[in-house]
């Protein structure tokens, strides 16, 4: 088990106490043992009471399946390959059928600890508007807030997702990409989180430009996840 850099930061939310504990430990680098374990816990929720049908989180040699299903069913489904199967297409499809949902995309899960300093990038808070990234945030998060650069060429959205964790997403218009703006947005985001809580980001592994931006801004990859909505 990885050693902690200190006490876990405060992470307040609702639903899925086991998921909250896992996230709090992951935030400070304290990971489950790489023992091929697949742990089933109850499904989490959003702050407004909406239930997440299922969430699968995994790291090096461990997985957590957060869903209101029989743990014995999960164990039987992944017994042939507990290292790879929990985030594999076959199990995720079966889980989605079991809970009556649709599997989302597989994302890399990254975290940034609270930042005491003000954002190092000039940002203007604005209304939600019609940007696709903001519409998606409104569909999957609560307490959504949006900032843009003064010229409107880049956007940062912040909101509370699974178990009330703070999550962010950034977008840079194609005409201004390649100038480090994505990295600047990723670096600025943690300072916008109220209450000294960690901030999370889900990045598609194929989106290498976004992944590089978050890593360059000091974000730490802690696993992968799929949300079944």
Question: Where are the predicted features?
Answer:
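Short, charged/polar, Gly/Pro-enriched secondary-structure boundary elements
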Residues: 115-122
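N-terminal charged segments
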Residues: 1-104, 124-141
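Conserved acetyl-CoA-binding loop-helix of GNAT-fold acetyltransferases
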Residues: 168, 172, 178-192, 210-216
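Conserved beta-hairpin
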Residues: 143-156
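Conserved beta-strand-loop-alpha-helix junction that forms the acyl-donor binding cleft
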Residues: 201-211, 215, 220, 228-229
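A conserved beta-strand-loop-helix scaffold within acyl/acetyltransferase catalytic domains
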Residues: 153-165, 170-173
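Conserved GNAT acetyl-CoA-binding A-motif
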Residues: 63-66, 164, 193-205
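Short, compact, well-ordered microdomains
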Residues: 101-108, 112-113
């Amino acid at each position: 088990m990885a050693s902690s850099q200190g006490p876990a930061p405060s992470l307040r939310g609702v639903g899925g106490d086991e998921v909250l504990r896992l996230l709090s430990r992951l935030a400070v680098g304290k990971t489950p043992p790489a023992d091929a374990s697949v742990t089933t816990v109850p499904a989490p929720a959003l702050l407004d009471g909406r239930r997440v049908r299922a969430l699968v989180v995994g790291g090096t040699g461990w997985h957590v399946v957060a869903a209101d299903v029989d743990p014995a069913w999960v164990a039987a489904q992944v017994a042939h390959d507990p290292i790879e199967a929990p985030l594999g297409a076959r199990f995720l499809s079966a889980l989605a059928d079991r809970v009556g949902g649709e599997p989302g995309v597989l994302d890399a899960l990254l975290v940034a600890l609270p930042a005491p300093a003000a954002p190092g990038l000039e940002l203007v808070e604005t209304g939600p508007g019609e940007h696709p990234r903001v519409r998606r945030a409104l569909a999957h998060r609560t307490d959504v807030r949006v900032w843009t650069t003064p010229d409107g060429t880049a956007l940062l959205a912040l909101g509370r997702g699974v178990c009330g964790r703070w999550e962010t997403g950034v977008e840079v218009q194609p005409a201004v990409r390649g100038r480090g703006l994505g990295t600047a947005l990723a670096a600025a985001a943690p300072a916008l989180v109220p209450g000294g809580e960690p901030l999370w980001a889900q990045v598609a592994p194929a989106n290498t430009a976004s992944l590089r931006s978050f890593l360059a801004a000091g974000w730490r990859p802690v696993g992968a996840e799929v949300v079944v909505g």
